[in-house]
């Protein structure tokens, strides 16, 4: 397993593990999706292989970031898959960062840029107030826009971000810079 840490962006990536080849084979690439020029990495093949998925979740759940956080925050939508499994394995509460129009109640919102456009994420204030330190979980790190959006939302509200855990990093997009 390779752990990469960037203090500047508070990002850790659990990217590879002992069954690297098997994991890579399960991540499919779709050219020109969701728009021309984008190579979309589909990580959903991982959850179709229970033993690989289980090993990945065990590895991610045993990180110091997860051990030391009060809660896990998962990013809409594929981050929910990995975040909820890690949350269950580590016995940590999970909070969700959702796209516009998906959460009820009093929200805090942050806009961000991604590889193929603009978007925003929201958190429920009432849930956020329960925890002080977070591990952020998503499926993939591309430009870093989504991860930085969540990090900024948390930090701007007095919360500590211990790190980010992802399954895949698209290094050519320099999301950690």
Regions found by a protein language model. Name each.
Residues 1-177:
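PRPP-associated nucleotide enzymes
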């Amino acid at each position: 397993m390779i752990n990469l840490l960037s203090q500047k962006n508070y990002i850790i990536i659990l990217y590879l593990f002992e069954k690297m080849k098997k994991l890579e084979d399960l991540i499919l690439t779709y050219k020109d999706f969701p728009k021309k020029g984008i190579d979309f990495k589909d990580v959903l093949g991982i959850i179709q292989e229970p033993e690989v998925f289980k090993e990945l979740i065990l590895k991610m759940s045993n990180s110091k970031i997860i051990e030391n956080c009060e809660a896990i925050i998962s990013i809409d939508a594929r981050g929910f898959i990995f975040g909820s499994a890690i949350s269950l394995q580590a016995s940590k509460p999970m909070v969700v960062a959702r796209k516009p129009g998906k959460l009820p109640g009093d929200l805090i919102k942050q806009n961000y840029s991604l590889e193929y456009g603009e978007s925003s994420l929201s958190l429920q204030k009432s849930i956020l107030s329960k925890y002080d330190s977070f591990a952020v979980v998503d499926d993939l790190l591309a430009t870093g826009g989504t991860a930085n959006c969540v990090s900024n939302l948390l930090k701007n509200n007095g919360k500590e971000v211990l790190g980010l855990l992802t399954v895949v990093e698209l290094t050519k997009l320099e999301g950690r810079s």
